[in-house]
């Protein structure tokens, strides 16, 4: 989140190194490529790019193309939080898949965890279905590129005591995430 404060807050990523990618192709680009080519050469078949919105898209487009010249089957997965950028990261930057955190995950989380709307009113089944449907319609032709999930290193597990309270409450979100779209995972 580009925090450079001497007094960072609890949600600031002060411990994350800020890499200077420059305005155009730099030595940093070449070093990053060397790292990915090294690991691809060792048999790594995919790379998950965390918070890719904080990395210049020009760099990511170049990097993906360069890696795929030597390892065309390597998969690139992006964590993108702004849904309005999903299409750009697939069609223009070249990512193979995106995590649908801001869409389906957040919708299912609201249904499971709160079961209330922003005003504290109970969410009826039709309201939950409407949110899921809206997300599905928003994705449209991007659905095959979306990876659905119920947990990751940044989020609480759906089946945890801090989240759904009861593992059986995760069955419906699991089925929705598995069968809602045509993603391969």
Task: List the model feature ranges, each with a label.
Residues 13-29, 44-54, 111-124, 155-165:
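The substrate-binding groove and active-site-proximal loops of carbohydrate-active enzymes
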Residues 22, 79, 102, 150-152, ...:
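Structured loops at beta-to-helix junctions and adjacent beta-edge loops in soluble globular domains
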Residues 36, 133-185:
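Active-site-proximal substrate-binding groove within the catalytic cores of carbohydrate-active enzymes
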Residues 1-38, 63, 69, 86-87:
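Substrate-binding/active-site clefts of carbohydrate-active enzymes
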Residues 34-37, 45, 50-142, 146, ...:
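Active-site-proximal helices and loops of the catalytic beta/alpha 8
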Residues 1, 60, 165-167:
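Aromatic- and glycine-enriched glycan-recognition loops and surfaces
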